Amino acid sequence: MASSFITVPKPFLSFPIKTNAPTLPQQTLLGIRRNSFRINAVSTKWEPAKVVPQADRVLVRLEVLPEKSSGGVLLPKSAVKFERYLTGEVVSVGSEVGEVEPGKKVLFSDMSAYEVDFGTEDAKHCFCKESDLLAIVQ
């Protein structure tokens, strides 16, 4: 899990400065100093099964295809990515979804899907509308 460091400035603070100038009497002048503090923001991992889509949205776990074909030919990344985005397993559904249930395998268009990163290393997920699903695979 990677952490990010950002610096956020505090408001200006006044503090006394002593001077040793011979022409000025020993007095305290106000100086202005700018402080800052550091915030350590750590990204959290989400359990995909606990994420509930809203309305007619569906959460789909993208199917990962092997990088080699059955004949041993290495497939280019663009071909693997294109095919992978067309199939997946439904993880959870919104309250207005009618026919689709969790556990079903679906085909969908990658143009209407919104990919999200839950911090899990094993799979990628995306949200799409129920109307954007092309088919349910039996």
From Swiss-Prot:
* Signal sequence, renumbered to the chain: none
Family matches, as CDD domains = cpn10
A Pfam family of the record is: Cpn10
* One cellular component term from this protein's GO annotations in UniProt: cytosol
In the database record, which residues form the transit peptide? Answer: 1-61
Show the SMART domains listed in the entry.
Cpn10
Task: Fetch the PANTHER family from UniProt.
Answer: 10 KDA CHAPERONIN 1, CHLOROPLASTIC-RELATED, 10 KDA HEAT SHOCK PROTEIN
This protein's name:
10 kDa chaperonin 1, chloroplastic
Organism from which the protein derives:
Arabidopsis thaliana (Mouse-ear cress)
